From Swiss-Prot:
This is Phospholipid phosphatase-related protein type 5. GO terms for cellular component: plasma membrane. CDD domains: PAP2_wunen. It is a multi-pass membrane protein. SUPFAM superfamilies: Acid phosphatase/Vanadium-dependent haloperoxidase. The lineage of its organism: Eukaryota, Metazoa, Chordata, Craniata, Vertebrata. One of its GO terms (molecular function) is phosphatidate phosphatase activity. Induces filopodia formation and promotes neurite growth in a CDC42-independent manner; impedes neurite growth inhibitory-mediated axonal retraction. Keywords: Cell membrane, Membrane, Transmembrane, Transmembrane helix. It is found in: Cell membrane. Pfam families: PAP2. Belongs to the PA-phosphatase related phosphoesterase family. One of its GO terms (biological process) is signal transduction.
Length: 321
């Protein structure tokens, strides 16, 4: 027996909640457990790429994790809620009901207002992308085990015991380090940069939201300034990681690519550039019309047209003669 539309919608909602819960759990295991073993990468004796001074714990950074995570989680929520509320109120004030989404039935008994539905949809996709970015970054750090620029300052290798008579001698193995194991493990997880990826993901998602949603007059200059300001903050976050010797340039660039790719994919392919359901249905309808086969109907000439054609030929012949 086929599922009713309401039951199918309810089933898909539960399925999406399971996917979201699984994504959050996977990010938790990557972030706070030792389930995934970090690849132990070796190094050359006195390698200048890893001899930078230790900049201190992450909390002493110019962009501490608490500040970064708070902004990445709070600013998009505030902007999207304010933006959707403003758009909804503007449509009510101008009585633009054609472009406004309709109230639909969700599940068996729940009627969802379009304002609530759009806000939850966009924030839910953003939250999913935030955890997905964290998973991508942690997976890359675990697999590569790339060393931080200040790795040797934390590793504190005993060069005499290791026999580092030449700079070209390669050292491998965890026993080569004598420093704090927890700090050493963190120094092995730098590629790609998590701070760069999360900051540029939040900035890119918000930039595309502002560009595609805010259509008010007089915002031709305000929108670019706001969007470029968000991207500039993300760019400065990556530069700060390099300036404080916490990441290499390659780590930051890779983090930028991960964050931008996930944001663009979710906005373009999942939320359809923040368009409403009505616009999506119209687009699908036009695509279906374009794909329909063209049927050619033969033209039937009427007797009156035949008589008119004969008279025209006779008149033309008389004029020539």
């Amino acid at each position: 027996m086929p599922l009713l539309p309401a039951a199918l919608t309810s089933s898909m909602l539960y399925f999406q909640m399971v996917i979201m819960a699984g994504t959050v759990m996977l990010a938790y295991y990557f972030e706070y457990t030792d389930t995934f073993t970090v690849n132990v990468q070796g190094f050359f004796c006195h390698d200048s790429a890893y001899r930078k001074p230790y900049p201190g714990p992450e909390d002493s950074s110019a962009v501490p994790p608490v500040l970064l995570y708070s902004l990445a989680a709070g600013v998009p929520v505030l902007v999207i809620i304010v933006g959707e509320t403003a758009v909804f109120c503007l449509q009510l004030a101008t009585r633009d009901f054609e472009n406004q989404e309709k109230t639909i039935l969700t599940g068996d008994c729940c009627y969802i207002n379009p304002l609530v539905r759009r806000t939850v949809r966009f924030l839910g996709i953003y939250t999913f992308g935030l955890f997905a970015t964290d998973i991508f970054v942690n997976a890359g750090q675990v697999v590569t085990g790339n060393l931080a620029p200040h790795f040797l300052a934390l590793c504190k290798p005993n060069y005499t015991a290791l026999g580092c008579q030449q700079y070209t001698q390669f050292i491998s193995g965890e026993e080569a380090c004598t420093g704090n194991p927890d700090l050493i493990m963190r120094a092995r997880k730098t590629f790609p940069s998590k701070e760069a990826a999360l900051s540029v993901y939040a900035a890119m998602y918000l930039t595309m939201y502002i560009t595609n949603t805010i259509k008010a007059k007089g915002t031709r200059l305000a929108k670019p300034v706001l969007c470029l300001g968000l991207m500039c903050l993300a760019f400065l976050t990556g530069l700060n990681r390099v300036a404080e010797y916490r990441n290499h340039w390659s780590d930051v660039i890779a983090g930028f690519l991960v964050g931008i790719s996930i944001a663009v994919f979710l906005v373009v392919c999942v939320v359809n550039n923040f368009k409403g359901r009505q616009a999506e249905n119209e687009h699908i309808h036009m695509d279906n019309l374009a794909q329909m086969p063209m049927i050619s109907i033969p033209r039937v000439e009427s007797p009156l047209e035949k008589v008119t054609s004969v008279q025209n030929h006779i008149t033309a012949f008389a004029e020539v003669t």
